[in-house]
């Protein structure tokens, strides 16, 4: 069985300072505590598009799980719903995009 991840892409916030404070102080601890079944959490701060132009996203969070069914179970749980609602609440640049993906890993 392939592993899976939840990807949350946050648009550039209208209030950068408030978003970053709430993301670090509230959201990340909430995700760590309440997202049942996760195996890894990766938070990326987007600097630019590859061509150095301004990116449409400010942060991308990736939360890894053993399977897609584990992602779905987490999102259906009270902790998953609370964490997703909080992501929407703090995202002052618009609603974040939530994606579920199957993970394939290639080692070199």
Question: What are the residue ranges of the model-derived segments?
Answer:
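Macromolecular interaction modules
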Residues: 1-108
